[in-house]
A protein has these predicted regions:
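Small/polar-rich, solvent-exposed N-terminal microdomains that initiate assembly or binding
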Residues: 1-63, 81-83, 106-108
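Exposed beta-strand and adjacent loop surfaces of beta-rich binding modules
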Residues: 11, 70-72, 85
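Acidic-leaning, charged glycine-interspersed low-complexity segments
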Residues: 85-121
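Generic alpha-helical hydrophobic packing signal
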Residues: 16-17, 70, 87-90
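Oligomerization/assembly interface segments of phage tail-like spikes and tubes
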Residues: 64-79, 109-121
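Polar/charged side chains located within well-ordered beta-strands of beta-rich proteins
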Residues: 7, 47, 69-71, 102, ...
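Short, low-complexity, polar/charged sequence segments that are solvent-exposed and flexible
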Residues: 53, 68-72, 92-94
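Small/flexible residues
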Residues: 9, 51, 74-76, 91, ...
Length: 121
């Protein structure tokens, strides 16, 4: 599964929960992006960012190792986090072996409330 494939699946699964990106000319887009969105865009509501390149891990095995790939997804809450938990539940029900981690907000550091999800390919 590529990052583009994952984006397509998540866009469908999270339809109605995603916030919006607004660019400099006022155009709006669903707040889901592979990589980092342009710095000139602003996000409102729930934002979903998908890593461009999957992480790889090698599990030692007899003679050869098994390589597993995972995609890292970040759900960022711009405002009330109500959609975040609903979105997290949808993603985890779609990929039962995925792992989620909460990153608590920190106003002093400018960190918004968010969850990172590691999804196996």
């Amino acid at each position: 599964m590529t990052a583009a494939d994952l984006r397509s699946i998540l866009a469908t699964s999270l339809s109605g929960l995603l916030g919006t990106y607004t660019d400099t000319d006022g155009s709006t887009y669903p707040a889901i992006y592979v990589g980092n969105p342009p710095s000139s865009w602003t996000a409102t509501g729930l934002e979903c960012r998908i890593g461009i390149v999957p992480d790889m891990d090698q599990t030692p095995a007899y003679v050869t190792g098994a390589i597993t790939e995972t995609h890292r997804v970040r759900l960022v809450s711009h405002g009330a986090p109500t959609n975040t938990l609903t979105a997290l539940r949808k993603v985890l029900s779609r990929w039962p072996t995925a792992q989620a981690r909460e990153i608590p907000p920190n106003e002093g550091l400018g960190i918004l409330a968010q969850h990172t999800i590691t999804i196996p390919t």
